[in-house]
């Protein structure tokens, strides 16, 4: 893996500034804690632990004391870079994760939800193609797979059950992982103040 880029945003909407998600006592933070933390968790899982963090945590539109946008660039000790944008001013629900590899890339878009508000969930992948510079250069052949059903909740419950009953030692998402992503969020907020 070379680098990754993720966007996780929502539309906001009428009365959004009064929503519990923008109430510090109830939510603890703004869009970074609401949605950004999930993208950060994915980035840690895919890219690794980050040793450098640069961030802008901003209130660009909603008149509330919490952030409605977080812009984050992070780097691992071995040089992998990840960029995250978490937004409550996307004006449409959006989930997008681009993963760039030495020999190609993956693009994940959408989330299967009951409302389908994040669009169709898909994964697109392609290999880099330098051999035919007249046609394929900059336009590699892509393949896209669409997903109509979300079984992640069932898989998580099954894994939890296997851990509790001793069939599996440790879940993929541990308490240590949760603590590490919360510490990363603290670093992002702290870096944004500098």
Where are the model-predicted features located?
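C-terminal helix-rich "cap/oligomerization" subdomain common to oxidoreductases
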Residues: 77, 145, 155-194
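Conserved loop-to-helix N-cap of the C-terminal "lid" that shapes the substrate pocket in Rossmann-like
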Residues: 32-36, 150, 172-178
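Hydrophobic alpha-helical segments typical of transmembrane helices
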Residues: 38-42, 95, 156-159
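Predominantly a Rossmann-like dinucleotide-binding segment in NAD(P)-dependent oxidoreductases
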Residues: 1-63
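Generic structural signal for secondary-structure transition and capping sites
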Residues: 1, 48-55, 81, 104, ...
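NAD(P)-dinucleotide binding in Rossmann-like oxidoreductases
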Residues: 62-67, 77-156, 171
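A short, mixed-charge helix-start or loop-turn motif at secondary-structure junctions
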Residues: 21-26, 141-146, 168
């Amino acid at each position: 893996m070379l680098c990754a880029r993720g966007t996780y945003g929502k539309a906001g909407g009428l009365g959004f500034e009064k929503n519990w998600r923008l109430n510090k006592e109830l939510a603890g933070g703004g869009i970074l804690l609401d949605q950004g933390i999930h993208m950060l968790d994915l980035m840690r899982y895919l890219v690794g632990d980050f040793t450098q963090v640069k961030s802008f945590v901003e209130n660009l539109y909603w008149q509330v004391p919490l952030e409605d946008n977080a812009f984050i660039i992070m780097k691992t000790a071995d040089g992998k870079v990840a960029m995250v944008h978490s937004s409550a001013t996307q004006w449409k629900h959006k989930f997008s994760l681009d993963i760039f590899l030495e020999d190609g890339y993956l693009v994940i878009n959408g989330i299967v939800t009951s409302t389908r508000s994040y669009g169709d969930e898909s994964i697109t992948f392609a290999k880099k193609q330098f051999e035919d510079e007249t046609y394929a250069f900059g336009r590699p052949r892509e393949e896209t797979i669409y997903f109509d059903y979300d079984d992640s909740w069932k898989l998580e419950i099954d894994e939890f059950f296997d851990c509790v009953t001793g069939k599996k030692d440790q879940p993929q998402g541990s308490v240590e992982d949760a603590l590490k992503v919360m510490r990363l969020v603290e670093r992002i907020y702290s870096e944004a103040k500098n």
